[in-house]
């Protein structure tokens, strides 16, 4: 299922955190934005643990694009990984690139600037500062990057959004 447009009203939060309504998909998002997609199920992971202490986490679901999810997270913690622990810190420019919804409208966002495409031409090529790039191909062309709070490329992982939920 392709997601070629992302707009609508958003106002749902993770883990009982304060809601952070967002009016539409686009350049109005905050700098620290985490993009991901889930093809089948809603988000089931738990937040509010010590891993996310002090972070505001927000779930953003477009009303007309049910496969796209956006997480606004000032501390930039990966919401499906338990690898990184410690105090919240801003993401240290791990990724570079741009993001586009569908076949047009490419924009750059925070978390170092993830590179990701949604829609029928969806793909992901993410680098960790230098020429260490990876590409993921997963049938339906939906992908999600992981942004860790360290500068090391060794702390970066890529997971395709296939199957039934978040990892």
UniProtKB/Swiss-Prot annotation:
Coiled coil: none annotated. Keywords: Keratin, Repeat. Residues 98-131 are annotated as: 2 X 17 AA approximate tandem repeats. It holds the Pfam family PMG. Expressed at high levels in skin where it is found predominantly in the keratogenous zone of hair follicle cortical cells and at lower levels in the epithelium of the developing mammary gland. GO terms for cellular component: cytosol; intermediate filament. Sequence repeats lie at residues 98-114, 115-131. In the hair cortex, hair keratin intermediate filaments are embedded in an interfilamentous matrix, consisting of hair keratin-associated proteins (KRTAP), which are essential for the formation of a rigid and resistant hair shaft through their extensive disulfide bond cross-linking with abundant cysteine residues of hair keratins. The matrix proteins include the high-sulfur and high-glycine-tyrosine keratins. Interacts with hair keratins. Belongs to the PMG family. This is Keratin-associated protein 14. The lineage of its organism: Eukaryota, Metazoa, Chordata, Craniata, Vertebrata. The gene is Krtap14.
